[in-house]
Every structure is written in C-alpha cells, then in structure tokens.
Amino acid sequence: MASFVIEGGHRLSGEIHPQGAKNEVLQIICATLLTAEEVTVNNIPDILDVNNLIQLMRDMGVTVAKTGVDSYSFKAANVDLAYLESDNFLKKCSSLRGSVMLIGPMVARFGKAMISKPGGDKIGRRRLDTHFIGIQNLGADFTYNEEREIYEISAEELKGTSMLLDEASVTGTANIVMAAVLAKGKTTIYNAACEPYLQQLCKMLNRMGAKISGIASNLLTIEGVEELHGTDHTVLPDMIEVGSFIGMAAMTRSEITIKNVSYENLGIIPESFRRLGIKLEQRGDDIFVPAQDCYQIESFIDGSIMTIADAPWPGLTPDLLSVMLVVATQAKGSVLIHQKMFESRLFFVDKLIDMGAQIILCDPHRAVVIGHNHGFTLRGGNMTSPDIRAGIALLIAAMSAEGISRIHNIEQIDRGYQNIEGRLNAIGARITRI
C-alpha cells in the first residue's frame, strides 16, 4: 500500500492542465464493443480504473493499440465470448465498477453478457436496478447465478420501447442507450441523465451511425439501426479535476491558471465555488484563480446559512462535495454540506476534525462546517484515503496544513487522478510518494 508524504504550507503558482474525464472515458471505451470497426479515442487519462478497463478489453479479444501519448484505438472484431464466462473475467469485473457498462454493448451486439457485482468506491449503496430494468424492458432476460454470484443476461432480439427511469442514473442511462442503438424499432427514455459525459457518448454513437435525438435533454429518442461503424472521439477535460484545482488554490491561497477546461461544460461548478467566496475568472477556455488571503461564504437572501447540495445534472455533481467541504474549513462563515445521493461519502470528516477543522456531522448525509477564516491552520496528520474523492480532499487539506502529513492507501487517489503528485509538484507542492 503506497502513501503520500506531504509538506504543507507551500503556495502554488503556474498553469495546470486537467486530464481527460474518467467518468466519460469508461463509457466511451465500453461503447467501442458496439462495432467491429476501429474506434480511436483521444485524451484518455492514465489512471488505474481506465487502465484496468483497457486491459480487460484486451483480455476479451479486442485489438487495442496505443496511437499517441493519450490516444488508443480499439477494434472489437474478434471478441472472445468464451472468455466472458471465465472466472478470471468475472474477478476483474468485480474490482471495477465501470465494468457494469459492458452489459448494454454486449447484449446488443452478441445477445449475451455475464458480470459479477462490480466494485469501485465504498461510498454507500449504488443500485444496479436502473441498468437491469431498462435493458429488461428492451427484451433481455436477467438471472442471478447464486453459485457463482454473477448476473447472466441474454436476449434473442432487443426491441425498442418507451421507459421512464426511476432515477436519472448516468451509467444506467449510458447502458440503456448502448443497448437501444442496435435494438429493433424506436426507444424513448424519459428521466434520462443529461450530463455532458452522457451527451458525449450519444454524439459519438451518432457519428458511428446511431440515430439518437434529444441529446442534452432528459428525453432521449433512439431509432435502432442494423450496425455501427468506426469513428474518432476526443474525451472532455475532467470537471472534477477542474473543481479540485479551484479548491486547492483557495485552500493554499495560491494563484493558478487551469488550462483548457471546456468551460461551457462545467455547469454550475464555478458558481458553486463563488458561493464559498472564491474568486475565479473565465479567460477564454481557461480559469484563472487569484490568490486570496480570505474568502467569505455567502448567505441566502433571507440571511440563513448557505447550503451546498448535490443533484443530478444540471445540478452540482456529488463528486465535488468532498472538495467543497474541505475548502469551507478555512472560509469565513458557515455552510451546510448536504450529500443527498450517497450515504457514506462524508465519513472522512473525522480525519479533518483531527487536523483541527470545525465540522459537525449531523447524519450520514449532512455536515455543518464552521470556517476558520485562515485564523487557525490545520495540523498535519496521518490518515487513510477511503475513496477517490475523499482522497483528493484530504490531499488538499494536507497541502494547506502546518507540518507533515501522510496519506495511506493512495491507490484510491490513483484510480481517478493521473500523476497527481508530479503535476502538483511542478507548480510548487511538496508531495513524495513512498
């Protein structure tokens, strides 16, 4: 188990580029299974979850070639269907949550799929019902093999239908869309997720020959086609990294420029940080964050305490609440952080309290943060990263703290952040991997 040793108290300065979006690229790679032709994907981040999925594709018989620094080509002309029933395949799926998005493409093109319960962050219950019910509505049969603890999915023919999703699940919508593009007839999906990464998937599928309309809305209409073809696709910058860097600059009172952020796809993320009192400027497609000695949390118009809560797009992504919580510890004022979508993502706050933060954990979903206004510097400490997003929040806290901190289990951070210590050290951080 690797660790970071962080020497806190150093200001950052310079430019930093966000990596390609993890949550987009996992969908895009799975979608390459929908055609026997070559698909080239650019701006792929070099992170653990993505690399594991790429290796899984190779193991499945997909021809994968690295064509550039961050570019890969995928050609799924000779998929090994027998391998999909092997214990090795199922074991790998169990450690990678993104593997659930293999179901839609596999059932659509090959008529069957097998998958174990996928892994990923331990951040609470993450239901698969939306995936399964949606694909069942298209005509697939699902069975659970208790002996092997796997899901078996099969379909002689998928047929278009109308469905209303019980939740606007991003991965659930992606899975259903990937199945529906090769189904016979028309499919309509109401209460579909509409975040930028899902829009990117739909646009790529249309370039491959799919017929999807309603992109960027919560009502998608899909006319099934006989086959899809190859294409090129470029992944968006990771909005979670962009938000993490904004928070990092505020906590360390640093001046940085975040380059090529695809500002129009950030939604309310910039405004949410402004509510915490953080100044930032859009400069073309870059974000400039000036150094601030203090930042004051806004109140609501009636004077009540500010609440920052997550919601399905175009609401605030839940992946940034951990960052906003830690940033609030050094703000002037108080804020209620309300994590609605997952019930155990706030359970890392005890580590921040040990560092000197003033936080009241109300319940598994809510925490009140009383900011120090930089009047009291957090203390360095020893901590373990429980998941990707808590890990980066703890790293931000350690970078602003007085003294030395150690973060263990940084493999969690590596799952979502590419060479994070190298990129941060290049602009003034002091982080050592041991």
Swiss-Prot record:
Its EC number is 2.5.1.7. Pathway: Cell wall biogenesis; peptidoglycan biosynthesis. GO terms for cellular component: cytoplasm. One of its GO terms (biological process) is peptidoglycan biosynthetic process. Its main location: cytoplasm. The active site is at D121 (proton donor). UDP-N-acetyl-alpha-D-glucosamine binds at R97, D319, M341. Pfam families: EPSP_synthase (PF00275). InterPro entries: Enolpyruvate_Tfrase_dom, Enolpyruvate_Tfrase_sf, MurA_subfamily, RNA3'P_cycl/enolpyr_Trfase_a/b, UDP_GlcNAc_COvinyl_MurA. The keyword Transferase applies. It catalyses: phosphoenolpyruvate + UDP-N-acetyl-alpha-D-glucosamine = UDP-N-acetyl-3-O-(1-carboxyvinyl)-alpha-D-glucosamine + phosphate. Phosphoenolpyruvate binds at K22, N23. Belongs to the EPSP synthase family. MurA subfamily. NCBIfam families: murA (TIGR01072), PRK09369.1 (NF006873). HAMAP family: MurA (MF_00111). This is UDP-N-acetylglucosamine 1-carboxyvinyltransferase. It comes from Bacteroides fragilis (strain ATCC 25285 / DSM 2151 / CCUG 4856 / JCM 11019 / LMG 10263 / NCTC 9343 / Onslow / VPI 2553 / EN-2). The lineage of its organism: Bacteria, Pseudomonadati, Bacteroidota, Bacteroidia, Bacteroidales. The gene is murA.
